[in-house]
Amino acid sequence: MRISLKTALLLGTLFGVNALSMDVAQAAQHKKAKPAVHKKHIRKVSINHVEQWQATRQLAVESGAALVIEQGGGGDTLFQKNADLVVPIASITKLMTAMVVLDGAPNLQAPITISDEDVDLLRGSRSRLQVGSVLPRHTALLLALMSSENRAAHALARHYPGGMEAFVSAMNIKAQSLGMRDTHFEDPTGLTSNNVSTAHDLAKMVLAAHHYPLIREFTTTSDASVEVKGRTLDYRNTNQLVKSSTWDIGLSKTGYIHEAGKCLVMQARLADKPVIIVLLDSAGKLTRIGDANRIKRWIENTSTTRKLMTRA
């Protein structure tokens, strides 16, 4: 008998809690039994079910909005919290930026020049790409996705046929084509809080972006060295989990502005199943990482319980 992961999440909790209740009742019935028999009964049955209940108890995350879905099949929802709340998404935006760039089938070796127009005057975010820097479109895309380089992302959009206005229009058209009905973009970087979406919509965007091999590669690259204006610049991935040996991540993107909080979206294999994770509006430096690890443990524990139930 095959049991889906979603079904296991529901049945596992009920099974564990009901079994625990039965153990309590059985213990009461055997209250007058001999001490040796009573001790043996509790050791053999009750402890196993307590452990199973602990493994399948309800997941709790600290992020303001969250969604976990199975990738492929029916796309079952495994967990959700405020998943339809429309919120700013910060640099998660850059996944859409990358898709629009690649949809245009550009020459990835063509040079991209950083200009004064690419400097962030809204928030004053830092960048090591000085005005006048020239780098291949391929490298600009890598930096935009891996290290969330705002000047690189803005320059990519500015070099789009028709310029910035045409690029942002293409972003919104792409969003609508993916069924992202509660999503709106006004810039390619995510620095504006007017770039908004929901966890449900972003799951659709992650699913779409996962079809692009270059996006998968660049978002999961842990670090890179880039030659710019005679200097070697070292960049790191903004998601520390891509370097973890305990994670199998196929796509990743982080984001942060004050209005959006800390954000993280990922495609990953957990318990040998591909899933999409969306975490929005996280407070604190490590909250989104902590939530991701809690989700990972929860799914892995649930999968173990499911296997036990299937064998039974």
Protein language model features and the residues they cover:
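Hydrophobic alpha-helical segments, especially transmembrane helices
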Residues: 3, 7, 95, 268-270, ...
